[in-house]
UniProtKB/Swiss-Prot annotation:
Gene3D superfamilies: 2.40.10.170, Bovine Mitochondrial F1-atpase, Atp Synthase Beta Chain, Chain D, domain 3 (1.10.1140.10), P-loop containing nucleotide triphosphate hydrolases (3.40.50.300)
PANTHER family, sorted: ATP SYNTHASE, ATP SYNTHASE SUBUNIT BETA, MITOCHONDRIAL
Lineage: Eukaryota, Viridiplantae, Chlorophyta, Ulvophyceae, Oltmannsiellopsidales
Taxonomic source organism: Oltmannsiellopsis viridis (Marine flagellate)
Record membrane topology: Peripheral membrane protein
Function: Produces ATP from ADP in the presence of a proton gradient across the membrane. The catalytic sites are hosted primarily by the beta subunits.
Protein name: ATP synthase subunit beta, chloroplastic
């Protein structure tokens, strides 16, 4: 973040406790809450240090308490502190595409500076009610299982649940690819408090699948903002807002549809809890910060559709000790419009995307929103899969032959549906060799309707595996002949 203050308001560090600093200013020049202040000076080794902090409390006696956005190693009492007079300001616009930033909006990919003309502050009000787009509309992803059974709302929030190695990253990259191709939109990825290795792997995979175009960065489809788990709590608490601010520019100024990924929303709450304890606030339920709902609401309310464009957010949700009643996931659930649950059992069967069709949910799955045809097809698919699930114990013990003719037909159709829910991805072409498929909603509904009515009972179930629409399944059946 560039600091250019003509009449510098300078204070002095009076106390340092880990990532928390107390700074004294003159009585008539106290900085505002959320102002960025920068500690400048030399440490004992003679090395220049510059640490940006954010004002959190006004203590009295002309002192403020601030939380550091980077390590406070080498800082000493008596060092000069410059009040920038504004909140943290980060670069926005097309120059951010294909780049990796830290919480301060500084590029960390060794590809040179980014122009910060007209950067935006990370603390901004949510859109006014009169500016919101209140029309319920589906955000079409081109992914069959999502569009049919747990459709995303345009401008909504989606929770992504899944353990390690079940295909979260590939699903995220496919969504980034599809929004760029089908909606002319862009994506912003906020890595909040996760592993550095995962961030590096994601960057490498994005370059390999051309989501990030190394030869021409402006043709990239995503901007990345990272605050890893080794960063101070202040950085992890604010990196989500940095990513959101970049996304808001694409929505409000460029009038685009934007996908905002937050991985992981739990780490945002966790960092807020650490900061709250460092500031001496009384903890609330299970040791979380008393302002948990306010902080979560402040972030989530800015993620919405306006009359200009939309931000649709997909948030990975870590559930501590698998306890869904923990205040962090429980507060997150209140804001979600849909959940996409990834299943290890489906991944083990080789069915990708491994989205669990029975556990994934959406508030959009209503006949008045989707239309009778879509809703009826989705419910029939779920009913068939549920019946198959109930019959699996019987099949395991007695075998298929002991089922009634009706149940055998249900099982055969359910197995076809299960395989037809798989799909080759564009971003997976490099390691599967199969060309990716974007399947329109009408083709998806048509395909599943025909499986349910029995029109395709004579096709082998293998012909439905890893294909796009129904025509491809029929063509594949001819080759299996």
């Amino acid at each position: 973040m560039n600091v250019s203050v003509e009449a510098k308001n300078i204070g002095k560090v009076v106390q340092i406790i880990g990532p928390v600093l107390d700074v004294e200013f003159s009585a008539d020049q106290m900085p505002n809450i959320y102002n960025a202040i920068v500690v400048e000076g030399e440490n004992l080794a003679g090395t220049k240090v510059s640490v940006t902090c954010e004002v959190q409390q006004l203590l009295g006696d002309h002192c403020v308490r601030a939380v550091s956005m980077s390590a406070t190693d080498g800082l000493m009492r008596g060092m000069d502190v410059v009040d920038t007079g504004a909140p943290l300001t980060v670069p926005v616009g097309t120059s951010t595409l294909g780049r990796i930033f830290n919480v301060l909006g500084e590029p960390v990919d060794n590809l040179g500076d980014v122009s910060n003309e007209g950067g935006l502050p990370i603390h901004r009000p949510a859109p006014l009610f009169v500016d919101l787009d209140t029309q319920l509309s589906i955000f079409k992803t081109g992914i069959k299982v999502v569009d049919l059974l747990a459709p995303y709302r345009r401008g909504g929030k989606i929770g992504l649940f899944g353990g390690a190695g079940v295909g979260k990253t590939v699903l995220i990259m496919e969504l980034i690819n599809n929004i760029a191709k089908a909606h002319g939109g862009v994506s912003v990825f906020g890595g909040v408090g996760e592993r550095t290795r995962e961030g590096n792997d994601l960057y490498a995979e994005m370059k390999e699948s051309k989501v990030i175009n190394e030869d021409n960065l402006s043709e990239s489809k995503v901007a990345l903002v990272y605050g890893q788990m080794n960063e101070p709590p202040g950085a992890r608490m604010r990196v989500g807002l940095t990513a959101l601010t970049m996304a808001e520019y694409f929505r409000d100024i460029n009038k685009q549809d934007v996908l905002l990924f937050i991985d992981n929303i739990f780490r945002f709450v966790q960092a807020g809890s650490e900061v709250s304890a460092l500031l001496g606030r009384m903890p609330s339920a299970v040791g979380y910060q008393p302002t948990l709902a306010t902080e979560m609401g402040g972030l989530q309310e800015r993620i919405t559709s306006t009359k200009d464009g939309s931000i649709t957010s997909i948030q990975a949700v870590y559930v501590p000790a698998d306890d869904l009643t923990d205040p962090a996931p429980a507060t997150t659930f209140a804001h979600l419009d849909a959940t996409t649950v990834l299943s290890r059992n489906l991944a083990a069967k080789g069915i990708y995307p491994a989205v669990d069709p029975l556990d994934s949910t959406s508030t959009m799955l209503q006949p008045q929103t989707l239309g009778e045809e879509h809703y009826g097809c989705a419910q029939a698919v779920k009913t068939t899969l549920q019946r198959y699930k109930e019959l699996q114990d019987i099949i395991a013990i007695l075998g298929l032959d002991e089922l009634s003719d009706e149940d055998r037909l249900v099982v055969a159709r359910a197995r076809k549906i299960e395989r037809f829910l798989s799909q080759p991805f564009f971003v997976a072409e490099v390691f599967t060799g199969s060309p990716g498929k974007y399947v329109s909603l009408s083709e998806t509904i048509q395909g599943f309707s025909q499986i349910l009515t029995g029109e395709l009972d004579d096709l082998p179930e293998q012909s439905f595996y890893l294909v796009g629409n129904l025509d491809e399944a029929i063509a594949k059946a001819a080759t299996l002949g």
